[in-house]
Amino acid sequence: MKLSPFGILFLFLLILNVASISSLNPNLNPIYAQETNSQQLIGVNMLGYYTSLPQTRDFKNPFPDNYYDQSFKIIKDGGMNHVRYVYYWESYVKNPTAFINELKFAATIADKYGLKIIYDNHQFHTSSWLNPQRGTGFPNFLFQNNSEYAYGSGGGPKYPSAVAWWTHWWNREITDVNGTDGWTLQSQFLKKVVSTVDSHPSTVGYEILSEPQVHSVDQWDKVGKYNTFLADELRKVTKKDIVYSMSIPVDLKSNIGVNATNLAKMTPANKTNTIFKFSIYGLPSPGSYQEERLNMFIAAGNLSGVPVYIGEWNNVDRDKVINEEGDFVYEINPEESDITPEDTTAILKKFNEIDPYGWAFWYWNFRPHRVENFNLVTSDPSGNLIPTKYFDILKNAVQSVNSGKGSK
């Protein structure tokens, strides 16, 4: 086809106009989108209200007004771009409507501030059924009417009830009263979370389950099958990142084989947009036990061929104590635990050497924690959020260590 001079000029202007529009619209410009999505996530863990309510207890602390707007603004102004949003399955069962509405609201406010959220399906001591005082996680209907894991019998890794329950969980033997297995039930719940927030630009991914318990050598492969099942189910409803977590307990001298090779067995078979999350609660100084653990996690990520994500980090002091079962365990000493500006800077510099997918400090919560350096924010009687000295320490370290650092 032969074009006239006018036709050539028109075609040139049309191409120029389309290019200009694409450069201004991230959705039309794949290069811009790639740069945006490759930005390292740096931020904090965060708890909400209805999304973290245990079934066996309620919160005594009032929920601050404009909690999300205040929080996200402070986090954004502090030079961070990320929130690992901690929620619990049993919180959904307790109040499904309030749970979903809070998720929607949090995602909308995160959009406003340009933050990036990973939604973390969390558990601590398995469930409030096993630990009514402190536990939260799996819903009560997965424990009822079974003498192996009676109410209040202990959900931490050292308790026989927790060992029994997690063993049945990995064998896919936990069911509801209708006989539907727990893996399927959990996938149905996670899909509800995805359908609620997946369309939001602030949503970058979903964590299958935070820090599941492993109690025997044969369970590593079973965790891999579980992660594969959940990841495959989530892939049916989202193209965003899927995060799988390290297990607990993390004792390098234990008889269950806590090493990079076994950790890599937990990786989902489909590694598309898959991330390995681990936690660090100490200074990984040269030659230290924490450095040995950190190196193991990095090696596990390398063996799996997936990026690593430091989904929780802080600095704590642990004491060796005897629990109710007569076993030695290490528990956090609230009085001795602390993190200094020097500690924070050293940890962030170490992270920069690793160049991870991202990291999230533990943590941002409207309820005060007995470990002082776990408190990034407090609230006054009027509901105004007030960052603590630990947020200032984190903010200043981020600014000094990451100044001038752009996209990866």
PLM features: what roles do these ranges have?
Residues S20-A33, L190, V243:
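Signal peptide processing junction and immediate N-terminal pro/mature segment
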Residues P368-L376:
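C-terminal catalytic histidine-bearing segment of alpha/beta-hydrolase fold enzymes
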